[in-house]
Amino acid sequence: LWKLGVTAKTQHNEVAPAQHELAPVYETANIAMDHNQLVMETMKKVAERHNLRCLLHEKPFAGVNGSGKHDNWSITTDTGMNLLDPGETPNENIQFLLVLACVIKAVDTHADLLRRSASNVGNDLRLGASEAPPAIVSVFLGTQLEDVVRQLVETGEARSCLEGSTLHTGVSTVPDLPMDATDRNRTSPFALSLIHI
């Protein structure tokens, strides 16, 4: 893939038998989409050369996890500033809160378009009603941002910000781990997984 210009940095096993995930390096959205298509075409050709089949159908077998094909995105300025970066104290980051409000409003206003872009028979079968149903367009903020937004709605200002929690492993040889306050919600097709929280 690197020879084709696709800078894939990660690959790992997924839930279904012989299912793998590939994560390319972030790049401009339209190039990332083109690379996504190129990766899928390349995987099919390489599999064929080895007398295998690469199944890219969203739900090839009932009762077995399907294949997701998506691109994560962000909004950056021409100078590289990430407008979806909440910083260490999102309750004080006015620029971030403004952009966040605009994204939430856009999802609410254009839910029908988002639904049409994410929904097809294969995706409905893959996700069903118990994971991330494309029929329901929602925004998941995570506990920290949800609290900041709640404060803004109820009082007009956000004076505090919840701290991230810790996962206590209970194993003496494994350290406790910080938990991401915005980790994606599997029931939301529009989940904010933000950095620095």
Labelled PLM ranges:
Residues 1-8:
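Carboxylate/His-rich catalytic cores and anion/metal-binding grooves
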Residues 189-190:
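Long, compositionally biased intrinsically disordered regions
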Residues 195-197:
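Conserved small/polar residues in nucleotide/adenosyl-binding loops
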